[in-house]
Amino acid sequence: QKISKVAPCGEFDGFSGDKVDTSGGTLLPGLIDCHVHLVYSGEADPKSRLLNLKPGQIVMSAFENAQKTLRSGVTSIRDLGGRDYLEFAVRDACNSGRQLGPTIKAAGRMICMTGGHGNVFGRIADGPDEVLKAVREQIHAGSDVIKLMATGGVMTPGVNPEDAHYTEEELRVGVD
């Protein structure tokens, strides 16, 4: 359900919706989480789990995560990388209202360098031409946002989070 009016009690003349007395409480707008991975479930090694699940199981888990997110007060999320675009099914169902969940903007496959952070499920792209092609592929697949793995990360064994993974030229091509 959506909030259709917020006003002092005396200003609801003629209003036909449900009225909720929030006296003594605090009303917050929906929260936004700008970095989630719906297909992950908080485990230390998401790669092993995802490699052992079938696509339908991954989608159902992502739906459950989306619904948990909404119940926690987060009404909009940005999913920054999933598995084989499976999170797009969750995004489309939630955004269309067919399923209960937050508003979702999804990146699709993370764009990463060979051997870099996210390379197991990401779209590997080395050099400016490959980065440009990878960005175009994500747009064609229906991505709302693009995620470029500019540095290493903590979830990929043997990768230093402080290391640069793309040159300035590669990043410019990916952003332009």
Language model segments and positions:
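Histidine/acidic residue-rich metal-binding segments in metalloenzymes
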Residues: A89, D129-D176
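Metal-associated gating/positioning segment near the N- to mid-region
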Residues: G25-S96, E169, V173
